[in-house]
């Protein structure tokens, strides 16, 4: 990762990295993530006007040429902290989930929006695709209010268990979207989360 991207990630969004449990599994192995085209489920173009804040319902990842390589529902139930420490974000199943303490997606949202999901070493999950996201890709969120598009600015691994408490690093940035999962490399779980940082474009 270029030094500038590393500094930006570490100083701006370190505290949004989640400690996600349940990333390992005893089931059969799965294919490595790739950018193979999939059918898009978000066909309506992002509107030119404002989109009122609303909980996200669907997420897609698209390459710079507009090819969709991830299309997934977002879990209807918001994600909350759990675990004995109260510092664990653990989605209930393989679907990504919106973190209820973060901003609600919309063109006027002042807070950073966070969507987190599992990535398993031995079974499939939509957010395994985060590993193949590159800067310049597009993240599309569909809500009940409309569709939002975000340009990916930075990607990379960060240590699990980073701050979820009050900290200067956990600042609100209008239009910012963070995607995070358990990082898996070579079919094995790591001690990192993989984080994608994107900025609202329309």
PLM features per residue range, with description:
Residues 19-22:
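C-terminal motif of bacterial Sec signal peptides marking the signal peptidase cleavage site
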Residues 1-10:
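Bacterial N-terminal signal peptides that target proteins for export
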Residues 11-16:
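Sec-dependent N-terminal signal peptides
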Residues 24-134, 143, 154-202:
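Solvent-exposed, non-transmembrane regions of membrane-associated and secreted proteins
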Residues 142-149:
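Short coil-to-beta-strand transition motifs
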Residues 137-138:
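Structural motif
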